[in-house]
A protein has these predicted regions:
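Periplasmic-binding protein-like
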Residues: 46, 72-85, 115-125, 166-190, 204-218
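Short amphipathic alpha-helical coupling segments at ligand-binding clamshell hinges
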Residues: 63, 117, 193-205, 213-214
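Short, hydrophobic alpha-helical packing/hinge segments within bilobed ligand-binding/sensory domains
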Residues: 142-145, 198, 211
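A bilobed periplasmic-binding-protein/Venus flytrap-type ligand-binding module shared by bacterial periplasmic
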Residues: 49-56, 91-92, 183-197, 213-216
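Loop/turn elements at helix/coil->beta-strand transitions in domains of secreted/extracellular proteins
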Residues: 73-76, 130-131, 149-152, 169-172, ...
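Extracytoplasmic ligand-binding site segments that recognize negatively charged/polar headgroups
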Residues: 1-143
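A ligand-binding cleft/hinge motif common to bilobed small-molecule-binding domains
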Residues: 2, 154-171
Length: 218
């Protein structure tokens, strides 16, 4: 975003720089439109959510609040080792609204008091004798921790959970309440020695066939 504002990376003209979809839909309408800037073209859209091992729980978790409910759902939880997404799910589970606007989570997190509130929620979970936390850093870890029985619930990426459940037959069930959408995208540095070829490569990497093919691996 800063690079775009400072003119370091190229601002795309989507209908000129990228091909239309096979059905003729212009690129400007075909791409996910909520990119962070006009200098970004997305290649992956995925969810941060949580999942559970259905063999280890007697009841069915359905909400973010259930992730923190160790009385009804005892057992350890796996959470990301960074504050990323942890603050959001903690506040959402504590009753703060999700979405856009002054009364919603990201606006509230500008206030240190809400950061403390989220951290206290996480700390309580990790120190709960009926709960406890295992921290993960690699995307493969959450389903592995669930499958091994080390944890009963884990935050993670929807594609990893899906692969474990469908591809490996693991008893892993995803919960979508409070999911956070995330994406990855490309940018093109302005004024490079091979900018025309780089733009062609970028258009090829983000065409419909290539992006659809990435679903085999995500």
């Amino acid at each position: 975003i800063n690079g775009c504002d400072e003119g370091i990376v190229v601002e795309f003209d989507f209908d000129k720089d990228f091909p239309p979809a096979p059905d003729g839909t212009p690129a400007r309408e075909d791409f996910f439109t909520d990119m962070p800037s006009k200098c970004a073209v997305g290649n992956i859209l995925y969810s941060w959510n949580y999942a559970y091992n259905s063999d280890l729980l007697k009841s069915t978790p359905k909400t973010l609040k259930d992730f923190f409910n160790t009385k009804r759902f005892p057992g350890k939880r796996a959470i990301y080792k960074s504050a990323l997404t942890n603050l959001e799910i903690a506040l959402a589970a504590d009753g703060v609204k999700m979405g856009k606007g002054g009364e919603f989570i990201y606006k509230k997190l500008e206030d240190p008091a809400y950061v403390d509130r989220a951290m206290n929620k996480i700390k309580a979970l990790c120190e709960d004798p009926n709960g406890g936390c295992v921290f993960w850093s690699a995307g493969a870890q959450p389903p592995e921790l669930l499958m091994s029985g080390e944890v009963v619930m884990a935050t993670g990426w929807n594609g990893r959970f899906f692969n474990a459940a469908v591809g490996e037959g693991a008893p892993i069930v995803q919960v979508w309440d409070g999911q956070g959408l995330d994406y990855e995208y490309f940018a093109l540095v302005k004024g490079g020695p091979n900018q025309a070829d780089a733009m062609k490569a970028l258009a090829m990497m983000t065409n419909t066939e290539m992006l659809a093919g990435s679903a085999k691996y995500i």
